[in-house]
Amino acid sequence: MRSTPQIPAEIEEYRDERWRREATRQVETAFDAERFIEQVGFAACLTDSRRPGPSLYVAVCGRRDAVMPRNVQKDREASLAWVLKDEIVRRGKVYYAKLGRGKTMFLAPRMIPYFHAVWGMRRSEEKRRLSRNAQAILKVLRREWEMSTSDLRDESGVKDRQAFTRGVDELQAAMIVVPTAVYYQPKFTYIWTLGVGRFPDALRRRVSRETALREIARCFLAGAGMTIPGEMARVTGLPRPDAGRGNRALVAEGYAAMLATGVYQLTARHGSPTCPADTDSPYAE
């Protein structure tokens, strides 16, 4: 059985700087968080060191080995990450939703067109691709524009909690609906709206799927320095063949070098911490 390639130490140090896994560059405010998301392009919300990729929670902790505790309510770092998430959603300067494969992510505005090209759908496709419950929820939101979870369940007629959640998740994954606020009193509820209301230009911009795959790969590799087999797919939710197509497009333009099957690294002129031709990396030829 083939072993999983290891990330070299110099690449981990590169990621420490890019993904704010350093105590001197911790995220402490919503403004810090928005700058972090803009710099990395996209980030998970509450993943820890056990999952690859940039993460708001890890950036709040400011260390590479951050692990989410079981009791998040009593943990200062987990609580701060949760509070920042809610504030970022209210501010509406970056995109936040549960996207492909159920991954809850933040997107910088510049990355929205590329993710939408992969996961979005045209209005003409909605009746064919969306479930009846998702269509019922969407019909209400297009009429009312913004509504709380409980009111939306009543108005749409999708009163079963699990069925409603699945419908909203469908709409989030298709980049049609986003949360705009969350309230905990007098009862817990999200406020939902159409994504195009918050990010009209980004969601209406048309790009090809091939361009989208290349730019998502570029964004990840710029922050990661190197990617190993399956890593980008795990972070972004892309199928592995699509992740590979994006990475190979970067090789074709000289932005990245392919060191082994599924292993790609930034070239030296694009900021790589090590150049394949000058390193004793096990991936170098």
Predicted stretch roles:
Residues 1-285:
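Long, low-complexity intrinsically disordered regions
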